[in-house]
Amino acid sequence: MKRDLTRDPVTKSMLLFAIPMILGDLLQQCYNIADTLIVGQFLGRDALAAVGSAFTLMTFLTSIILGLCMGSGALFSMRFGQRDEKALCENLCASFFFIALVTVFLNILSFACLDGLRTFLRVPAEVWSDMREYLFVIFMGIPAVFLYNYFASFLRAIGNSVIPLGFLAVSAVLNIALDLWFVIGLNRGVAGAAEATVIAQYVSGLGIAVFTLARFPQVRSIWKLRCLRRGRIQEIVSFSTLTCVQQSVMNLGILMVQGLVNSFGPIVMAAFAAAVKIDAFAYMPVQDFGNAFSTFIAQNYGAKESERIRAGLKSAVCISMAFCVVISALVFVFARPLMAIFVDAGETEVILEGVRYLRIEGAFYCGIGCLFLLYGLYRALGRPGMSVVLTVVSLGTRVALAYLLSAIPAIGVIGIWWSVPIGWALADLTGLFYYKARKKELLA
């Protein structure tokens, strides 16, 4: 099913398009959380710290692929809005080969640098063995991440967010079932948790690839080398590379913060591992809504529907802020029972540190909600460079303040937690100022 976001009622079309994306990411988070929950409850604190640190690293690596796919998807949306089938096919071909080459290079580099990661991330000796074992397996799933995100980006670009949801649902259920079997039934340890995730990733990646190639003839142009055009390759590199930089800079900053967290030992590492999963789960719907909003803006920008863009922007701000207020209240109130889901009740220090993190971050979700809308807006309007600027402001502030504040004995680790909302606020102010100064030019 295709959804034309240039014709349907503005708010209704955004919500109907966003809901399957939100549900899909909920499932994605479910199979990320499955690793954390099962490892934390059945393998202990050190294993939880290992998987948590490995997850942060994998998020950085896969963000490179995700950014390339998101940038290409914005261009696909514009071509769909313009009804330019020939240009769409050429963009598909150029993007597939470009992102596939990056994926192969990234996969080789990951294995080559595996043993050097311990020093870079400052991983304690008691955690490294489990972390290395987990990473060695999980790196094998990087090609599957490319397949799923590439074909999902095409489907979403033409307004179909339901099919990616279906494949993700199958993958999530399979991952949780395999997690339980491998970790608890077969005693495979952290390697079993990683194996479950990789198998599930290939099911969703190969499945969506086969479906899309069979259902949409224009996608088969990815195999036609004659469709490669120098101009199209330059377009893809321009759009996707800047979005990739935005995503990878964001996650590189988080990875640097992870290294700082690791220096505080296994208790803080375990608290951070669990709290970050809760945090991501809480604001994930508004992140997906920002991506849906971006597709809406891109299609209408391609169709030159400036009034719909303005109406969509107003509607998106109201929806996003309303959600953030509600979820902030819930996370603040239920921080302790949420931590208890992931951590054994006897680990009181871990739970206490996680609660402190959640109550600080959770109070400021409106900041990240606004930032996701700004990312989506500038990406859709062909200004991905501005998204990079906002990311540098947000993450640069976060990393700098985290290292500065945590070095003060009276503040310590809580300085890392406070650096996050401060970074969001500064990036929001930067993005809003730019929009106000360039509004006529942007929406022309």
Per-region residue spans from a language model:
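Hydrophobic transmembrane alpha-helices of multi-pass small-molecule transporters
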Residues: 60-63, 175-179, 205-209, 281-284, ...
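Short runs within selected transmembrane alpha-helices of multi-pass transporters and secretion channels
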Residues: 69, 138-156, 164-172, 193-208, ...
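N-terminal transmembrane alpha-helices
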Residues: 5-43, 56-71, 75, 100-107, ...
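Transmembrane helical elements of multi-pass membrane transporters/channels
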Residues: 16-35, 137, 171, 200-204, ...
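Short alpha-helical transmembrane segments in multi-pass integral membrane proteins
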Residues: 1-18, 76-141, 185-241, 297-364, ...
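Small-residue hotspots at the loop-to-helix junctions and early N-terminal turns
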Residues: 45-56, 135, 194, 266-281, ...
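Helix-terminus/linker motif at the lipid-water interface of multi-pass membrane proteins
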Residues: 26, 30-49, 118-125, 181-188, ...
